[in-house]
């Protein structure tokens, strides 16, 4: 309800956090406008809701577009809406299983999406662990989205696919290490090897 959103907004502003939420219909999008969020988010289930996509793109805010449960034709249409209006966006590779098994994550799709759409690509993970998110960064993901919870045993549709505090800390730590681990790709003899 409204009181929960006001609590989230107040807390995040106090901590300097840019929060935002997925609007699942135009009325929800109008509701979220009162919080002057910097970003918009299209949930995977809304990827084919053309009036909603057009309204979101019309706001001109950078939008994160999740692509779970979709075919290329759906992504093509969404991308064209945002490109025609010149609204900045990031495609979020996602598998809409809660939780996703590691073998369902298909992280190799990230560079494919990047090449096909010539845009920023991120990863919205719903797996139990942290490795797929780290591998997503190694494959070129520029944004990582994970659900978080205080307790994975709590009741809720996505609690088991969420990270607790320690899991979030590990994800951030390991994702930040990817660049130095990947290196430059140049074949050089390091000082330690000499």
What are these regions (language model features)?
Residues 1-194:
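Catalytic cores and adjacent flexible loops of soluble metabolic enzymes
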């Amino acid at each position: 309800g409204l009181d929960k959103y006001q609590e989230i907004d107040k807390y995040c502003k106090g901590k300097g956090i840019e929060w935002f939420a997925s609007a699942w219909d135009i009325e929800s999008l109008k509701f979220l406008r009162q919080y002057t969020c910097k970003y918009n988010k299209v949930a995977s289930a809304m990827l084919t809701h053309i009036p909603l996509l057009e309204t979101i793109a019309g706001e001109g805010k950078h939008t994160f577009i999740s692509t779970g449960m979709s075919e290329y034709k759906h992504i093509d249409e969404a991308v064209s809406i945002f490109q025609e209006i010149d609204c900045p966006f990031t495609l979020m590779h996602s598998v809409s299983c809660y939780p996703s098994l590691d073998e369902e994550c298909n992280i190799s799709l990230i560079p494919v999406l990047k090449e096909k759409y010539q845009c920023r690509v991120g990863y919205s993970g719903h797996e139990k662990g942290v490795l797929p998110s780290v591998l997503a960064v190694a494959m070129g993901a520029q944004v990582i989205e994970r659900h978080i919870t205080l307790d994975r045993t709590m009741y809720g549709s996505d609690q088991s696919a969420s990270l607790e505090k320690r899991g979030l800390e590990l994800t951030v730590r390991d994702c930040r290490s990817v660049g130095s681990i990947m290196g430059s790709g140049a074949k050089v003899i390091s000082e330690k090897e000499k």
